[in-house]
Design a protein with these regions (language model features):
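Short, well-structured N-terminal submotif of metal-dependent ribonuclease cores
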Residues: 1-47, 56-73, 164-188
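Acidic, PIN/NYN-like endoribonuclease modules and their adjacent C-terminal/linker elements
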Residues: 1-5, 120-188
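Alpha-helix capping/helix-boundary segments
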Residues: 14, 51, 85, 118-119, ...
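A general structural signal for well-ordered alpha-helical segments in protein cores
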Residues: 31, 52, 86-89, 116
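Short active-site oxyanion
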Residues: 41-45, 74-77, 125-130
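Phosphate- and divalent-cation-binding pockets in alpha/beta enzyme and binding domains
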Residues: 54-55, 88, 140-141
Length: 188
């Protein structure tokens, strides 16, 4: 994605990937590069409160401190579920009910469906046009309301992080062939 939108929604999976030591070096580089680009472009990166709560469930005190540090960055926006988000959620739920299936053809537990929709509704109410999530349900809900869905792995990998692939040719073994010693001929 060459140009970042003005408002971008992320979820708990993004937050976990950002802080986890288990995240691959390439994915860490993608996230760092994305955040640098977002700050430079003056995009607003939206961290919805339900996603923050989901992250904090498994985080220790360091997780709270991390969130406090993020809160100080002006391009990061910690977003509540407010009246505008409630309106957007009602539109998402109504569309699902109009199809005759409030779960919208997903087998997920109803509580997960509601939280995923709340996350998307918060982003939609703040003008997000892109969501970054590893959760297919969040991305699908985002698509239904006209947002683009991406995973961390689909973010641009910065040039500095790209490893040069060397084509190494294995050495051939020469079984049964002995080197021949060639003596110089004496010419003089």
């Amino acid at each position: 994605m060459k140009t970042l939108p003005k408002a971008i929604l992320v979820d708990a999976n993004f937050i976990v990937a950002y802080v986890s030591p288990k995240t691959s070096a390439d994915d860490k580089a993608r996230i760092e590069h994305f955040l640098e680009r977002a700050e430079k472009a003056r995009s607003k990166v939206i961290f919805p409160m339900p996603a923050i709560a989901e992250f904090l469930v498994r985080a220790d005190l360091a997780g709270v401190e991390f969130m406090n540090r993020l809160d100080k960055k002006t391009f990061l926006h910690m977003a509540d579920f407010n009246r505008a988000a409630a309106f957007e959620l009602s539109q998402i739920d109504r569309a699902a009910l109009n199809t005759g299936d409030k779960k919208d053809e997903t087998g997920a537990p109803w509580q997960k469906i509601k939280v995923d929709r709340q996350i998307v509704a918060i982003g939609k109410s703040l003008g997000a046009t892109l969501v970054i999530s590893a959760d297919g349900s969040v991305r699908n809900n985002a698509l239904r309301v006209g947002m683009i869905g991406m995973t961390v792995q689909e973010l641009e990998l910065p040039e500095a992080a790209k490893q040069q692939k060397l084509a190494l040719v294995p050495a051939k073994k020469t079984r049964g062939i002995r080197p021949v010693l060639v003596k110089p001929t004496g010419g003089g």
